[in-house]
Regions:
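Short His-Asn-centered micro-motif
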Residues: 30-31, 70, 128-129
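Short, solvent-exposed polar/charged micro-motifs at secondary-structure junctions
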Residues: 41, 77-80, 136-139
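Short histidine-centered beta-strand/loop micro-motifs
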Residues: 42-43, 79-81, 113-116
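Residue microenvironments linked to proteolytic maturation
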Residues: 12-14, 20, 25-27, 86-156
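A glycine-rich, hydrophobic loop/mini-helix early in the fold
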Residues: 57-97
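Short, charged/polar surface micro-motifs in flexible loops or helix N-caps
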Residues: 37, 73-76, 105-107, 133
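Residues at the C-termini of beta-strands that transition into short coil/loop
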Residues: 34, 72, 155
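Polar/acidic, low-complexity leader/linker segments enriched in S/T/G and N/D
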Residues: 1-65
C-alpha cells in the first residue's frame, strides 16, 4: 500500500476557465476538485498509483475559510481571494467544486496572476486539504478520498 500522509495534502488536478473582467474587478473561475475521475498521483517502476475524489467527499468538510493563492503560498504569501470576505465564492456541483475568485484590479500581483491565467501560462489549479476518510484498492492501486476534513486553499 502506498504512503498515506496524515497531514495536509496537495493535489494538482484541474484547469482554469477563461478569466473575465469588468470595470471594477478581475474574475477567475475554475474547478480545483473534480469528482470520480481517477488521477495518476505517481508512477513507480512502471506501476501507476491513482487517486479518486468521491462525489460526497466535501460533505461536512470545513470550508469556512479557505483562500485562493499561488503555488500554495510557497514563494508568494499573497492571498488573492478568500471565502471569509466573499472575494472567493464556491459551489459544489455534481462534477466537483467550482470556484470564482474576485481579484483586485489595483493590485499589481493580482493583475499579474490574472494575466498569467488569461495567457495560459498558468492553466491548472490545485488544492490542499486534510483527509477524514479514505479507502485503498490494492488491485487497481487506487486510493479513494471518501471524506475531506478541511480545505485550506485552492491554488493557481
Amino acid at each position: 500500500m502506498p504512503y498515506k500522509p496524515k497531514e495536509r495534502e496537495y493535489r494538482n488536478l484541474a484547469s482554469f476557465d477563461t478569466p473575465t473582467s469588468d470595470n471594477d474587478e478581475l474574475i477567475v473561475r475554475g474547478m480545483p476538485i473534480v469528482f470520480n475521475v481517477p488521477t495518476v498521483i505517481c508512477e513507480f517502476d512502471g506501476v501507476e498509483y491513482k487517486e479518486v475524489i468521491a462525489s460526497g467527499a466535501l460533505d461536512d468538510c470545513d470550508m469556512s475559510d479557505f483562500i485562493l493563492n499561488r503555488n500554495h503560498g510557497a514563494n508568494d504569501a499573497t492571498v488573492y481571494a478568500r471565502t471569509r470576505n466573499d472575494s472567493l465564492t464556491y459551489q459544489i456541483v455534481p462534477q466537483g467544486l467550482k470556484i470564482e475568485g474576485h481579484l483586485d484590479k489595483e493590485d499589481e500581483r493580482h493583475c499579474n496572476l490574472y494575466r498569467d491565467i488569461e495567457k495560459k501560462r498558468v492553466d491548472k489549479m490545485s488544492f490542499s486539504f486534510v483527509v477524514r476518510e479514505d479507502s485503498y484498492d490494492s488491485e487497481t492501486r487506487t486510493r479513494t478520498i471518501l471524506k475531506i476534513k478541511k480545505l485550506y486553499d485552492v491554488s493557481a
